[in-house]
UniProtKB/Swiss-Prot annotation:
Location of the HTH myb-type domain: 11-63, 64-118
UniProt name for this protein: Transcription factor MYB58
PANTHER family: MYB FAMILY TRANSCRIPTION FACTOR, TRANSCRIPTION FACTOR MYB58
Pfam families documented for this protein: Myb_DNA-binding
The species this protein was found in: Arabidopsis thaliana (Mouse-ear cress)
Amino acid sequence: MGKGRAPCCDKTKVKRGPWSHDEDLKLISFIHKNGHENWRSLPKQAGLLRCGKSCRLRWINYLRPDVKRGNFSAEEEDTIIKLHQSFGNKWSKIASKLPGRTDNEIKNVWHTHLKKRLSSETNLNADEAGSKGSLNEEENSQESSPNASMSFAGSNISSKDDDAQISQMFEHILTYSEFTGMLQEVDKPELLEMPFDLDPDIWSFIDGSDSFQQPENRALQESEEDEVDKWFKHLESELGLEENDNQQQQQQHKQGTEDEHSSSLLESYELLIH
């Protein structure tokens, strides 16, 4: 491995700590006469028991004539913030863009003041963004609620329209059914009303036409009826019912003659009275 850069001085033989007024005067007078081309050899040439790095920092940060004293202005702070976004913690580059300001001062003002201010501003912006987002959500909800009510009202109106359409459909169906019923009544064949005072010969003619159309069936039916009558007469003769029927017929005939005789007597009597 390489040894690296050699130290500028022996740390055991140099003085540390704050600078005295005499040390500041020696450094200022030497730089005004000889300049500061080589900081490594400057302490020995100026008669200072200090390190070259310590002399450089003392001159740059405190003793040079163009060093600004006091607080940083608002413009300087904004410049430091912008440069820090570009260069980061490279304080020497930032100091080169700000004449009269040292890198040590810039670093101190950044850590003590500007960094805290940026963090507070970012938190404030985040809070504002959250509040704006909540306001936008509330506005959207308020806008959506009238739309929802409008949609609900529209649904009610549409349901009412649907009910009206359904009722109209039912009415149309009923009227159509009534109309079809009327058409069926019109299309029914008219029944001929037969007069009650028809000539009895018509019915005999109809019966005759039936008998003419079916002579064989009529003859077969009459033969069957004759057979049934013969069978009933045979049964009455076997049971003795035929004699009883003859006696009843004779009694009825006798009673009828008696009634006719009595009625004729009454009529003659009435004629005599009158």
